[in-house]
Amino acid sequence: MLHDCFFSAPLTSVNLLNNDIGEAAADIVRAAEQHGKIQTLCGITPDQKEADFSNDWLKAADAVLLAYDIKVNAPLKRLQLNEAALPIHELKTATSVDLSSKSLQNTDAIIIASLMSMVNAPLTTLNLYWNEIGVEGAKAIAAALPR
């Protein structure tokens, strides 16, 4: 049913943040990738350079949707989900990033993991010391590590 929604109309933009979709977020991302024309699952505009969701109480599923937006919206350089802003541009282009003691949470770690798994990501050193990424965030980072 959800799959049919993406393919039946020329939909290019949808905002699914703050819905209790849980693990279905990954299915939505896969459907959007297959569709090929979806530019946002979170309402981020194609020319947007910064996004602040720090007051939106986003969950892990929201971070999965945002990770899709970051991959398809290249101009986005800064994203704030919690206390600290994530340097998206730096995470995409730098070889070393220090994010120690930033009070990062699981949602931040999911975004970081998504950027780590990008094909051309040059990141070789990432410092996440003294944060609050939790088990879910640690699992996302572990899944993004090179095999």
Question: Model-derived features: where do they sit?
Answer:
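Leucine-rich tandem repeat or coiled-coil scaffolds
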Residues: 1-147
